[in-house]
Amino acid sequence: MDIEFRAARSDEAALISDLAMRSKAHWGYSADFLDAVRLELTYSPQVCSSGSLVVAERSGRILGFYRLVEGVPESCLDSLFVDPSAIGTGVGRALLERALLAAQAVGARTVTLEADPHAEPFYAKFGAVRIGEVPSESIPGRLLPHLRFDLAE
């Protein structure tokens, strides 16, 4: 797979935010739901240029991204989104593997995340375990799976 990874740039904020919305819409959510999560899925130029947001691209086209908040002993996978046209092609796996390696490189022993319920099976396939549920910041009453990866020493 000829995917290249690099830090996002501030001038890509709108493109990255649009990709996140299209990826979320892939799961068949209603327009009202998507409007409710729009702010949460909007990435500022500052976030994009912070170094915590990494894009996967092929031939200059962004196929997906992740944002890792590094910490020791625990890092947080704040987001991971794949362009709908690239879902099922290995891009998500490549992004996840890269994020977990980055967390391990800074000394994290675990990586936690709040997953979309539709994405929980994807993360479980790669070893994530559910450690609870957390309330959605955008949708009152909605609970999200709280997952954890235990990293090898």
Predicted regions and their residues:
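Conserved GNAT-fold acetyl-CoA-binding loop/helix
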Residues: 17-43
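A short beta-loop-alpha structural element at the N-terminal edge
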Residues: 4-18
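Conserved beta-strand in the GNAT
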Residues: 61-69, 76-81
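Conserved acetyl-CoA pyrophosphate-binding loop and the N-cap/start of the following alpha-helix
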Residues: 86, 90-98
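A short helix-loop-beta-strand connector motif used in the catalytic cores of GNAT acetyltransferases and
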Residues: 43-55, 76
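Conserved beta-hairpin
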Residues: 52-64
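Conserved active-site tyrosine of GNAT-family acetyltransferases
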Residues: 123
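C-terminal "cap" of GNAT-fold acetyltransferases
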Residues: 109, 114-118, 126, 132, ...
